[in-house]
Amino acid sequence: MNRTRSASMAQGGLNWDSLPLKLFAGGNAKFWNPADIDFSRDRADWERLTDDERSYATRLCAEFIAGEESVTQDIQPFMAAMRAEGRLGDEMYLTQFAFEEAKHVQVFRMWLDAVGVTDDLHHFLDDVPSYRTIFYEELPDCLNALTIDPSPAAQVRASVTYNHMVEGMLALTGYFGWHKICVERGILPGMQELVRRIGDDERRHMAWGTFTCRRHVAADDANWGVFETRMNELMPLGLRLIEEGFALYDPMPFDLSVDEFMAYASDKGMRRFGTIASARGRPLAEIDLDYTPVQLEDTFADEDARALAAV
């Protein structure tokens, strides 16, 4: 692709109020370094856990680090799709997005090393087949499809898979689990800080995915059907993944409740329908300056904070 012009030099410059560039500025303002997190107390807390508790926590961490590695690799085609569409602001944000995902791989690996977990962890994924279906098949297939077909419909399918299922349902539910484990026991302060930092990054990622779906739905109502169909395909698979993980333990370590986790995941998935639907019939120009996607993620964060404060 030959370059014929530079968007950053166009008359009027860049629109810093557009949602993608707001997210970009927010990420710059909230930069954090994994090496600054203190994991020194986590090793002692880890040693005091039971074998089953360590097994479950290791499984949860294995699912996270493999997931973070997957999304680090799989986001690349979305950048190219934004370039093909001429959306420099989105492309700028996605460079930051990819960097943050790579940083999440780093910090989870640092935590595992700090608590002494250095064995091969692949077997933790073998008995949760839905995990492999989502992360090893559905995610790369949907994102790689953008290299051939960067159309709005393909972007919506990719965003639903990445931003709404992997991040918006599964990762949020995993963070909720980590918080319950750590806060109720008053343990693993390094993990608590790790999850807080990553969660802040992921809220921006999910907001971008919601924004992307909303602008395509506003531009062509047929894309609402694409969104709805893909969500309905993936939500049962995501819920099955949660069930498979809980079925491996009896009793469940940390007294975690499968019903609570299923309800949490379902709620996060279903409430995204309304936010996307609200873009139907809207003037496309309004969507670029509509911060509803950010507000939704902030609402989720506030609800979690209140729930955990009551523990």
Swiss-Prot record:
SUPFAM superfamilies: Ferritin-like. Mn(2+) binds at E68, E101, H104. The keyword Oxidoreductase applies. Its cofactor is Fe cation; Mn(2+). Fe cation binds at E101, E167, E202, H205. The keyword Acetylation does not apply. There is a cross-link at V71-Y162 (3-(O4'-tyrosyl)-valine (Val-Tyr)). Binds 1 Fe cation per subunit. GO terms for molecular function: metal ion binding; oxidoreductase activity. InterPro entries: Ferritin-like_SF, R2LOX, RNR-like, RNR_small_fam. It comes from the Bacteria. Homodimer. Belongs to the ribonucleoside diphosphate reductase small chain family. R2-like ligand binding oxidase subfamily. This is R2-like ligand binding oxidase. It comes from Mycolicibacterium paratuberculosis (strain ATCC BAA-968 / K-10).
